[in-house]
């Protein structure tokens, strides 16, 4: 069993030793017995007995070894983002490009369950193989990210908004990595809500440190922040799917009943929201713009 573990989760050259029905029989470098289903072969590849070919080796749920020529996005030596398929009591199940899903155990996920990833999120992981040949996803540690991120030593990205995913979530702040490899830290004072592990979020860059790590914020620039009346209107727009049947000609009584503000305050607030391109003012209604919706997506 220990010998099997040497090749599991990695790409190896295996010898084709036979064909049993629709299943090829392969032999590993240490004599391991490995099976290959024809559905896991490259379309343009014909295998010959006695020849060696490159395969990725993985265990099925009972620990039996299988091979595939469809190389996965990650191996036990390579980290990458993998899509979350679902979560359950055991943890998060991810797609790494194999015929079977891979589990990231619940013990490795945040203690606060609301910060667990949701289907469609992406976790930065590698593969881990235990002594029984069971395969799991392992989250990237801080030391791993230290060796793979792209450093930035200038202010060219300052005030730019980029997409990134948290690979580590702590009370003190959120640690994120972008598709371009930028490592970003968002201090707790620069967020109103904590993003989920693996959630795609928009983060505004506010600086960098000597290591080339970026500092970010989930908060808007000071001049873009909403006053109390504007926030009330914005929150109601979000609650009612981005549209409210009110505008600058609505009656003072209706405005007072719904928004608990005077008509003058309402007109000033929607005027401010309009100038910031957060809402559109139409005949008989106000609606959220694309920029308005993006404030929610970036947790502003």
UniProtKB/Swiss-Prot annotation:
Q: What is this protein called?
A: Conserved virulence factor B
Record PANTHER family? CONSERVED VIRULENCE FACTOR B
The similarity annotation says:
Belongs to the CvfB family.
The function of this protein is:
Contributes to the expression of virulence factors and to pathogenicity. Involved in the production of hemolysin, DNase, protease and protein A.
Which keywords belong to this entry? Virulence
* Bilayer-crossing regions: none
Instruction: Output the Pfam families linked to this UniProt entry.
Output: CvfB_1st, CvfB_2nd, CvfB_WH, S1_2
Which InterPro entries does this one have?
Answer: CvfB_fam (IPR014464), CvfB_S1_2nd (IPR048588), CvfB_S1_3rd (IPR048587), CvfB_S1_st (IPR039566), CvfB_WH (IPR040764), NA-bd_OB-fold (IPR012340), WH-like_DNA-bd_sf (IPR036388)
Protein species of origin: Staphylococcus aureus (strain bovine RF122 / ET3-1)
